[in-house]
Amino acid sequence: SSIAQAPGDLAGRVVALEQGKSFASAFSSLAESLEGLKTSIEGEIKNTVSTLNTEMHGLADIQAKLISAGGSGNAANSLLDQRDKSIAAISEFVGLSADYKLRGDATLTLGSTGNGPFLVQSKSAGVISVAFEEGKATVYAGTGASITATKQATSGVLAGLISAYDIINQTG
C-alpha cells in the first residue's frame, strides 16, 4: 500500500481514511437495508397470518351451512364448490392435509402428515399465529387450549416468508 511505502505522506493517509469511511458507510447502508427488509417481511407474515385465519373461519362457516343443508341438493353443490375454493385458497398459504367426511365437510390439518394441528374441523376454525423471538419466526397453530408451536408449516406462502425472515436474521 502507499502508506506502507511512504508513511510520512499525508495524502496517502487521507485517501486511506476516506476509503475507510466509504467502506463503513456502505456497511451501515447495507445493515439499514437488511433491517428494512426484515421489517417488511415481518409485516407480510402478519398480513398472511391474518388472511389465513380469515380464510379458515370462512371455511368453517361454509361447512356449518353444508352440514345444515344435509349434504345433498343444489344448495349443497354450491356449498361444496365454495368449500373447495376455500380449501384451495388456504392451501396457497400453508401446506395441509384434508380429510373429507361423508356429510361433505372437511377436516384440515397443518402439514402433509395428517397429524399436524387442526386448521379447520367441521364447523370450527383453528388459529395460526407467528411469534418473532430471538431472531426466529415460530409458527403456533391449533384450536382452543391446544395452540402450540409447530414445525409443520413447511410449504406455501407462509413458509416462504418465514424462511426469508430467518435468513435475513442470520445475515444481519
Predicted segments, located by residue:
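Phosphate-proximal small/polar/acidic motifs at interfaces that engage nucleotide phosphates
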Residues: 58, 67-172
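Alpha-helical heptad-repeat coiled-coil segments that mediate oligomerization/polymerization in large
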Residues: 6-16, 20-23, 27-83, 97, ...
